[in-house]
Amino acid sequence: MGRDIEKLRALFLKFYASVPDKLREDIIALVDDKTYSWNSTFVEVNGKTALGDKILKKLEQIGLFEEG
């Protein structure tokens, strides 16, 4: 844990590219009592927003980027 935000961004974009279109509306994160789908997370992460960074940290915390 604790990877830098650019590394997390790159990992998320790699994961996102492999998610089938039909699953991209599925919720993947809950941040500040709001839910975020793959698509809404992509918009924030790709736009390099503060919210996107916060979502990436949450996804790392729940183990989305674990290898193996």
Question: Over which residues does each language-model region extend?
Answer:
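A short, conserved structural fragment
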Residues: E60-G68
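Inter-domain helical "communication" segments and dimerization helices
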Residues: G2-E6
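Intrinsic disorder/low-structure terminal segments
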Residues: L11-K14, L64
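Short amphipathic alpha-helical interaction segments
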Residues: N46-Q61
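Short secondary-structure boundary micro-motifs
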Residues: M1, L13, K48-T49
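Short amphipathic alpha-helical interface segments
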Residues: L13-E44
